[in-house]
UniProtKB/Swiss-Prot annotation:
<keyword id="KW-0929">Antimicrobial</keyword>
<dbReference type="GO" id="GO:0050830">
    <property type="term" value="P:defense response to Gram-positive bacterium"/>
</dbReference>
<dbReference type="GO" id="GO:0031640">
    <property type="term" value="P:killing of cells of another organism"/>
</dbReference>
<dbReference type="InterPro" id="IPR023388">
    <property type="entry name" value="Bacteriocin_IIa_dom_sf"/>
</dbReference>
<dbReference type="GO" id="GO:0005576">
    <property type="term" value="C:extracellular region"/>
</dbReference>
<dbReference type="InterPro" id="IPR023384">
    <property type="entry name" value="Bacteriocin_IIa_CS"/>
</dbReference>
<dbReference type="Pfam" id="PF01721">
    <property type="entry name" value="Bacteriocin_II"/>
</dbReference>
<feature type="disulfide bond">
    <location>
        <begin position="11"/>
        <end position="16"/>
    </location>
</feature>
<dbReference type="GO" id="GO:0050829">
    <property type="term" value="P:defense response to Gram-negative bacterium"/>
</dbReference>
<keyword id="KW-1015">Disulfide bond</keyword>
<comment type="similarity">
    <text>Belongs to the bacteriocin class IIA/YGNGV family.</text>
</comment>
<comment type="function">
    <text>Bacteriocin that inhibits the growth of closely related Enterococcus species and a wide range of Gram-positive bacterial species. Inhibits the growth of several strains of the Gram-negative bacterium E.coli, but not the growth of Gram-negative Pseudomonas species.</text>
</comment>
<keyword id="KW-0964">Secreted</keyword>
<dbReference type="InterPro" id="IPR002633">
    <property type="entry name" value="Bacteriocin_IIa"/>
</dbReference>
<keyword id="KW-0044">Antibiotic</keyword>
<keyword id="KW-0078">Bacteriocin</keyword>
<protein>
    <recommendedName>
        <fullName>Bacteriocin enterocin-M</fullName>
    </recommendedName>
</protein>
């Protein structure tokens, strides 16, 4: 599960990220994840 700490930081079981700083990185991870899954 993903947890929000209310200040733009989210954590899941493996890592934490700052949404404001990482939106583009998350999009890139999702895209590359889909590409590697093909």
């Amino acid at each position: 599960a993903t947890r929000s700490y209310g200040n733009g930081v989210y954590c899941n079981n493996s890592k934490c990220w700052n949404v404001g700083e990482a939106k583009e990185n998350i999009a890139g991870i999702v895209i590359s994840g889909k590409a590697s899954g093909l």
